[in-house]
Amino acid sequence: MAQNSLQIHCKDGSVYVIPTENVDSITFGDADSLNVVEVELAGSWLWGSAEKGYYELLSFSKDHTYTAYDNYFTYGFDTTTYGFYSQYSAMLTLWSNGFGYQHRYNWYITGLSANALSVMTKMGPFTYYRLQPEILNIRVGDSIKCTDGDSIVFADGVVVRIEDGKLYGIKEGSTFIQKYIASTGLIYAYKVVVE
């Protein structure tokens, strides 16, 4: 017989029955330490790989629409797709216009935190990092040096590049980077404008 419910017996005699399909996790602790903050998918998330030659910026809205901007910087072109999404527990389904015809992608969310969205797709695992509202500005030929143990972990190498722990502006335009913040041990994404 399948076990499909969780039954909780309270000291006051009340009993609660919760279907296990509604349970995502159970955490034990004292009441003061159990301030759980639900992380939302809404916002923008960046995945990038200099080795693979492109980055993708996913932007999820609270109305369940999304856009995906892919910049294939190695090949010199970019694409934007849009559509809507649904999330049921750890399953994320994206429907898009996909170059003029319908696409549906089923992704399994393996991790969702304040700064990172990790998914398993048909193409393998990917981790996207939350885009911060701060925009970094740099001039062509100038650099930004990371301080306090921070480091740039992704740059496209076309608009900006990483060299000797610094971010250099190569040509005018805008792009995105991923930056490791040593004080938190987390990676975040930032937009960079080069003038």
Report each predicted region and the residues it spans.
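Bacterial Sec-dependent N-terminal signal peptides
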Residues: M1-Q7
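N-terminal targeting signals for Sec/Tat export/insertion, comprising classic cleavable signal peptides
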Residues: H9-S33
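Coil residues (strongly favoring Ser/Thr
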Residues: S25, S33, H64, T79, ...
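N-terminal helix-cap/turn-to-beta initiation motif at the start of protein domains
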Residues: A31-L46, R139, K145-T147
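Edge beta-strand at a domain terminus
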Residues: D32-N35, D78-Q87, S118-E134
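N-terminal glycine/threonine-rich, aromatic-flanked beta-hairpin/loop signature
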Residues: A50-Q102
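Extracytoplasmic soluble-region selector
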Residues: T80, S86, Y105-A116, L131-E195
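Beta-sheet ligand-binding and adhesion/scaffold domains
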Residues: M91-P133
